[in-house]
Amino acid sequence: MVDAMNQEWWKKASDVVNAFHKEKAAIPSNAQRAREDLKENIAFLRTYLEFNYNLCDKVVFSGSAYEDLNISGDNIEFDVMLIAQRSNFLYLTECNNGVCKIRSNSPFLNYPFDEDFNIDSEKYRSFFFGLIQKWSNMMMTHKKKSFTLVNHGVATQMNVNDEKGILWYQVDLVPCFEAKSSLISEEKFYCVPKPIPNQRLYWRLSYSIDETQIAKKLSNDAKKCIRIIKALFKLETNGLFTKFTSYHIKTSAFYLKERGNWPNEENLGRSIYDFLVFIKESLKNGELKHFFDRTINLLDKIEVSTEQLANTINGWLKNEQKFLTKFSSSIDANIKQLAIK
């Protein structure tokens, strides 16, 4: 299909995809104000954790809203890593497939240990939730803030409401330890309390800091491409791509960027076409490696037929008209007309 397309067609494709972005995939208008409110709240939380419990030496902001990857209509979502730097005392053991145990070289730290001084991730996660609950109650009393808290995987999810009590934005508050890779090594890793059934001592290695650094360095066009694919999969596929998450999409973009010559600086339509081709091939092969740990295949447990998803994308790419129609079917009538000219 690509060889048959001329410059005039690519210009049309770019116009249609840009219009789709404007209507379906733009950054939410209130995201910046949410970011400012979040930073104020986290400053209070850091003070609370650092000076009362010595459990926050460093804060790292991430998540789709912080990385400019949220789309209009989505909940505004942030991740915040609350890092206790303990590499002088903690080291990793039994690392495999992105999970590990954290062991202390000192019995005098006040953490939930087993008999071998491994930190119990499940107990620590519950302990951390309790601390956030106490802080939240103080914020509602003294700062008149409106929060609700829920357990959310490794994180405590904080739902922040506006003045009318309506959900404004969500934050995953992630407790994290910085630990050495082994007792004799100075290499440092970040670990978060991943819930694994019947394996409460295991933690997940986190690469959120590296991911955020790469995401923030992506060009505006690359971020636009990610938002467009997110909107396409979310809004135009009747839920078929629910299991192919925004994390899969962002990882695909990292690989395309690593290859070079992406995104196409002159034509957004071509960038999106190349993006879809990469995702289709990954799904067809049933393989999308974790960008920072390539022993992990992110499609291993996707719980949906990757072949079906690949065939669906292939249908969009079969010819020029199908590609244009996929982006114009739900938007302004003028753009629909442009797509069929």
Curated annotation (Swiss-Prot):
ATP binds at residues 64, 77-79, 230, 246-250. Signal peptide: none annotated. Disulfide bonds: none annotated. InterPro entries: Mab-21-like_nuc_Trfase (IPR046903), Mab-21_HhH/H2TH-like (IPR046906), MAB21L/cGLR (IPR024810). Its EC number is 2.7.7.86. Nucleotidyltransferase that catalyzes the formation of cyclic GMP-AMP (2',3'-cGAMP) from ATP and GTP and plays a key role in innate immunity. Acts as a key sensor of double-stranded RNA (dsRNA), the presence of dsRNA in the cytoplasm being a danger signal that triggers the immune responses. Directly binds dsRNA, activating the nucleotidyltransferase activity, leading to synthesis of 2',3'-cGAMP, a second messenger that binds to and activates Sting, thereby triggering the immune response via activation of the NF-kappa-B transcription factor. The gene is cGLR. One of its GO terms (biological process) is innate immune response. PANTHER family: CELL FATE DETERMINING PROTEIN MAB21-RELATED, CYCLIC GMP-AMP SYNTHASE-LIKE PROTEIN-RELATED. GTP binds at residue 172. It comes from the Eukaryota. This is Cyclic GMP-AMP synthase-like receptor. One of its GO terms (molecular function) is ATP binding. Mn(2+) binds at residue 258. It catalyses: GTP + ATP = 2',3'-cGAMP + 2 diphosphate; GTP + ATP = pppGp(2'-5')A + diphosphate; pppGp(2'-5')A = 2',3'-cGAMP + diphosphate. Its cofactor is Mg(2+); Mn(2+). Mg(2+) binds at residues 77, 79, 172. Keywords: ATP-binding, GTP-binding, Immunity, Innate immunity, Magnesium, Manganese, Metal-binding, Nucleotide-binding, Nucleotidyltransferase, RNA-binding, Transferase. Belongs to the mab-21 family.
